């Protein structure tokens, strides 16, 4: 039976890998998270480099987060909020409000 008839992706089958799921970093919902983080950084009057210095990271680390090339886990989210001088709760509320608006618009 040819691979095309089995539903197997020929590119991934030949490499011995399973097909990848869509990257959640590029979802509309995660775009909201990124937008809130970028807005909070700008509201704090910080450049990417200045925020990175507060986090003990490189400027490219923050840039990758903001471009959606790196996902933020909960602990890093809390550290970012603290470095911006805002509570993680406040950022989560902003995210929840925008996600609600996104859902209503759909």
Locate predicted features.
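Alpha-helical residues within the helix-turn-helix
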Residues: 42, 53, 82
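Short alpha-helical DNA-recognition segment
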Residues: 45-67
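The DNA-recognition helices of helix-turn-helix-type DNA-binding domains
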Residues: 58, 69, 95-99
